[in-house]
């Protein structure tokens, strides 16, 4: 929409005619229609402004950007102002309703559910009243005349109809609630693929081994590596000890002649000789030494 509107400029010049153009939710104004090609003097986005009419003058209206700016405008007559108000309001409503289809569906479903809930409350009140009426008919005192069959039938039919309507409305509420809370309406976006785990740094491994002493594989491996080296280092010492022990045993004679003799290096026919002399052999040798030698005849 486009046309002439008077715009308030200042106290010196007062109201000045301007050419206004409303396009795609933006209201732009120019000095005249011929100056449209030169560029606008100003523009207003309808989505962020409020429309206000003058309470006394039926040709004036205001466009207010909260906390920033006021635009005072006046039409030629009341009918022209009404045309502009309808166009500006429609443009603002179309721009304001920028919700997605899913959000609109949720909002409409919520409104429908609220309406059905209010209907249920109304039918519940009607049911209570009708049940109370029937109870009065049944428990009427003897001094009152007995209720007619027609009145009882009418009350019963009303109660039955109200119950049916209540049940139908309740079923509709359940359907709306199921549609409102269906999973696809609130489906979350798929999560991003997981990032491959990063191997821990040596510093982290040392911290873990310090905090968990039972699982220090690195220390065990270091100990197993150090042990062969120390064993190799001790091997020559063991050999030296064995050599020195055997040498000292061979060099020093036994103090007791009755003590068993150790033969470390003597062999008989390639086999090791007995390490000790049997007791019978020693006795035989002793008796032979004690017997006198007989002269040869």
From Swiss-Prot:
Region (Interaction with VAPA and VAPB): 97-297
Composition bias type Low complexity, residue spans: 215-224
Pfam families recorded: PH
Localisation per UniProt entry: Golgi apparatus, trans-Golgi network membrane
Disulfides per UniProt: none
Keywords: Golgi apparatus, Lipid-binding, Membrane, Phosphoprotein
Functional note: Plays a role in regulation of vesicular cargo transport from the trans-Golgi network (TGN) to the plasma membrane. Regulates Golgi phosphatidylinositol 4-phosphate (PtdIns(4)P) levels and activates the PtdIns(4)P phosphatase activity of SACM1L when it binds PtdIns(4)P in 'trans' configuration. Binds preferentially to PtdIns(4)P. Negatively regulates APOB secretion from hepatocytes.
Protein name: Pleckstrin homology domain-containing family A member 3
Membrane-topology descriptor: Peripheral membrane protein
InterPro entries the UniProt entry points to: Boi1/Boi2-like, PH-like_dom_sf, PH_domain
Domain (PH): residue spans on this chain: 1-93
Organism lineage string: Eukaryota, Metazoa, Chordata, Craniata, Vertebrata
